[in-house]
Amino acid sequence: MRVDDDRFPWDQDSILSRDLLSASSLQLCYENLNRSCVRSPYSPGPRLILYAVFGFGAVLAVCGNLMVMTSILHFRQLHSPANFLVASLACADFLVGLTVMPFSMVRSVEGCWYFGDTYCKLHTCFDVSFCYCSLFHLCFISVDRYIAVSDPLIYPTRFTASVSGKCITFSWLLSIIYGFPLIYTGASEAGLEDLVSALTCVGGCQIPMNQKFVLINFLLFLVPTLVMMTVYSKIFLIARQQAQNIEKMRKQTARASESYKDRVCKRERKAAKTLGIAVAAFLLSWLPYFIDSIIDAFLGFITPTYVYEILIWIVYYNSSMNPLIYAFFYPWFRKATKLIVTGKILRENSSTINLFPE
């Protein structure tokens, strides 16, 4: 989605002459082909470390999110509208780990694209679509948590399975409708024809974005982000007020046990806190990348390659974060994972196992 170069001159002849000069001293992606891209490989030590780091992220994204999806879809106790949203979010992150991260790993470490022009475009479409799909899911989840915390007793009648299904459908359709035509129609490259021609070489996969679509991308990121920040600030205020009210009631009545409403409020606040951490992790991962994209689009792609690689892999690693967050905060997820890993979910009636502590 950007130019993979440290300093980009906008003159095509200077690019070609520089590439020819580099080709005489550096390796090529395809040694026996004309117009092969220049390859600058890492030495064996750093190369091995990078493969280990990037590969671990891809495996964690695939396996961790697969655990989340399996847990929610298999165990009946987890069949709720809110959890279906979480499972759909895990599906988007799972697809990032499966269709994007392994191929980006090879490109980042080897400096070449070995998977063909067709999958180069598909890879970029997957990248854009699935990542925006995650963002839209998180936005809807934040709204769901706001409803649950603000009035937990009527929440089940407001956020139903039908509403959850509409949120999931909207998230997937909008991200796919935006991502795929954007890349396949070449709309993102309009006005950059000379740049695209200069960058075209065998073993490359650079799809630059013009200023118009960089701004559209940023707006698609900014609007849900503002919604989430507004909603979670309200959730924080409501949760704090509820906690103060419950504490006052306990002091006044000296009750040893909690009321049903107190328990529901406490549970919903914990869920909101956990998913709030997931949202914060997403925003911290994505914001530096979007800021860099805007800077590059308007200042001529000045970001050094290694800085861009760091930013994009922070984004990719976000797809691996949510299962770790769930594992840390949710005992039911740890128990479900143990049942899946040990194969106990294959037993008869395993879907009815109680995952929640008494």
Curated annotation (Swiss-Prot):
Residues 69-83, 144-166, 234-274, 334-358 are cytoplasmic. Disulfide bonds join 37-201, 120-205. GO terms for molecular function: trace-amine receptor activity. Its main location: membrane. Glycans are attached at residue 34. GO terms for cellular component: plasma membrane. The chain crosses the membrane at residues 48-68, 84-104, 123-143, 167-187, 213-233, 275-295, 310-333. PROSITE patterns: G_PROTEIN_RECEP_F1_1 (PS00237), G_PROTEIN_RECEP_F1_2 (PS50262). It is a multi-pass membrane protein. It comes from the Eukaryota. Keywords: Cell membrane, Disulfide bond, G-protein coupled receptor, Glycoprotein, Membrane, Receptor, Transducer, Transmembrane, Transmembrane helix. Residues 1-47, 105-122, 188-212, 296-309 are extracellular. Signal peptide: none annotated. It holds the Pfam family 7tm_1. It is found in: Cell membrane. One of its GO terms (biological process) is G protein-coupled receptor signaling pathway. Belongs to the G-protein coupled receptor 1 family. Olfactory receptor specific for N,N-dimethylalkylamines trace amines, such as N,N-dimethylcyclohexylamine. Trace amine compounds are enriched in animal body fluids and act on trace amine-associated receptors (TAARs) to elicit both intraspecific and interspecific innate behaviors. Ligand-binding causes a conformation change that triggers signaling via G(s)-class of G alpha proteins (GNAL or GNAS). In addition to the well known disulfide bond common to G-protein coupled receptor 1 family, trace amine-associated receptors (TAARs) contain an unique disulfide bond (Cys-37-Cys-201) connecting the N-terminus to the extracellular Loop 2 (ECL2), which is required for agonist-induced receptor activation. This is Trace amine-associated receptor 7d. The gene is Taar7d.
